[in-house]
Amino acid sequence: MDAANLALGHESFQAEGAAFVRNRIYPSIYDANHVTHVTASTPIEIDRLLARVEQEYDGIDHRQFDVDFRTPPSFIARLALEGYERRDALLMLLEGDLADSKPECQIRPLESEEDWREYGALKHLDWREHEQRIKKAPEPEVGEALFAVARLKQPPVQYWFACLDGHPLAYFNSWAGLDGIGQVEDLFTHPDFRHRGLATALIHHCVAHCRGKGAGPVIIAADPADTPKNLYAAMGFRPIAVYSHYLKKLPTAKPAK
């Protein structure tokens, strides 16, 4: 489910026992350029897949594979051998009602160019905070690309603002999803306005929007090393699975063809 969400707005195709997601316009964004749903398991199959990956991502300075419990262990072992670094994601599911009551605040959809400019300003704060948390050197161009990639997803994803006195101070998105399972994602609140119920209000609104579009259960992906997972758990989301991103940064990249 989360793999389908990550592929929204990008080129995707099947080859050599895997699903490829690619966006040559935004080569620095890992989630826009990765491989998932790997079934290659024998040494020959794995060699063929890795060779195809080099062909399809020529000119891009990273390689990322998204894996879960269905991925052949032999393929994951090959990634470990070749020096890929693992980063986990926690998948959480809401089946019933949310536990907390919905705080009162204005929620409105992102629709206009001005809305997207406001989103871009908040996304810049989100990216800077992320860089500081993981002690990464500033890469403002990546933050700008993340903004553009998020916009590619709408529609079918719908972004929402939570506002105080008419000013957008938090955002989140909702997607009706596939096969009756919705997804909510990309939650951020301005650091100066946290603990005022904005995030909780957005979660309520986005879950309701998914269900209004036909979804029953709703999922969210969380960073197991960060604190938002605790908010989701307190509101009724339960952990159901862990999947992993295996990443390798290349020392140099050829010019994209």
Q: Which functions belong to the PLM regions below?
A:
Residues 12-16, 74-85, 156-172:
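Conserved beta-hairpin
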Residues 72-86, 200, 224-242:
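Conserved active-site alpha-helix within GNAT-family acetyltransferase domains
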Residues 1-60, 71-72:
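N-terminal charged segments
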Residues 43-120, 128-131, 244-248:
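Acyl-donor-binding surface of acyltransferase catalytic domains
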Residues 1, 34, 40, 90, ...:
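Short amphipathic alpha-helix that is part of the acyltransferase structural core
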